[in-house]
Amino acid sequence: MGLVKPKKFLGQHFLKDLSIAKDIADTVDVCPDLPILEVGPGMGVLTQFIMQKNRPVKVVELDYESVAYLRENFPALEDNIIEDDFLKLNLEKLFDGKPFVLTGNYPYNISSQIFFKMLDYKDLIPCCTGMIQKEVAERIAAGPGSKTYGILSILIQAWYKVEYLFTVHEHVFNPPPKVKSAVIRMTRNETTELGCNEKLFKLIVKTTFNQRRKTLRNSISSILDKENPLSADPIFNKRPEQLSVQEFIELTNQVEAALKNKTDIVYSNDIARKGTNKKE
């Protein structure tokens, strides 16, 4: 069959530059010997170099046309092509419950969702690499005090060391995206336990960053009553982008300890969804 036509509704931008594809494939070398799962292989420009790593490889592709192309041009991959939506997969079943490396030239329209799913399976994914929008990569790698520091930054950096590796320009894609891209690598840090109530931690992070112009005192009033003595702590005069991951962990412990009846804590996504049109 001929070349696959990129589909806008799937966020497809096919990489044309083989040297960049090889560089992306080489980012998985930090986790040697582990099997590899590639998301959104398209026509296999990255896949061909991943397969040279001599490790078990599976690919997940939703586009039926791309699947047909892969089956025709990568016969050795035949039994390891998963025609499905990555976001709906049970990742525990892919490699018999064993850890694996996640990589890909990720579809731009779901890149953030891919990383939230990665966090759900963080104990199975010690390393995640790949290419995404430059803006999203900068957010993930951002530190406290940065305008791009946000929900993704905190939640990912709580569990992973993040490396912004290099920038990729628009002209090496078909079709060229309207934004620059970047290659990043996320490697699990030594954290095995967060040191706080993880569900409350996520709620506080999402709630405060969805109201990032407000001080913590105002943004978490839905969780902690303003009359609570804890609200007098100077930390509540800060805005969320001023806090490190560790400070968010400490804040979570303070808030939980201050609540009189812990069973009354509402771990509701409804609170966290406030301002969901804002960037994560």
From Swiss-Prot:
Matches recorded under Gene3D superfamilies: Ribosomal RNA adenine dimethylase-like, domain 2 (1.10.8.100), Vaccinia Virus protein VP39 (3.40.50.150)
Residues holding S-adenosyl-L-methionine = 13, 15, 40, 61, 85, 105
User: What are the UniProt keywords, alphabetically?
Assistant: Cytoplasm, Methyltransferase, RNA-binding, rRNA processing, S-adenosyl-L-methionine, Transferase
Q: Which cellular compartments is it found in?
A: Cytoplasm
Family that this chain belongs to: Belongs to the class I-like SAM-binding methyltransferase superfamily. rRNA adenine N(6)-methyltransferase family. RsmA subfamily.
Q: Which GO terms describe its cellular component?
A: cytosol
User: What is a single molecular function from GO for this protein?
Assistant: 16S rRNA (adenine(1518)-N(6)/adenine(1519)-N(6))-dimethyltransferase activity
Organism lineage reads as: Bacteria, Pseudomonadati, Bacteroidota, Bacteroidia, Bacteroidales
Reaction(s) the record says it catalyses: adenosine(1518)/adenosine(1519) in 16S rRNA + 4 S-adenosyl-L-methionine = N(6)-dimethyladenosine(1518)/N(6)-dimethyladenosine(1519) in 16S rRNA + 4 S-adenosyl-L-homocysteine + 4 H(+)
What is the stated purpose of this protein? Answer: Specifically dimethylates two adjacent adenosines (A1518 and A1519) in the loop of a conserved hairpin near the 3'-end of 16S rRNA in the 30S particle. May play a critical role in biogenesis of 30S subunits.
What this protein is called in its record is Ribosomal RNA small subunit methyltransferase A
* Disulfide-bonded cysteines: none
What EC identifiers does the entry list?
2.1.1.182
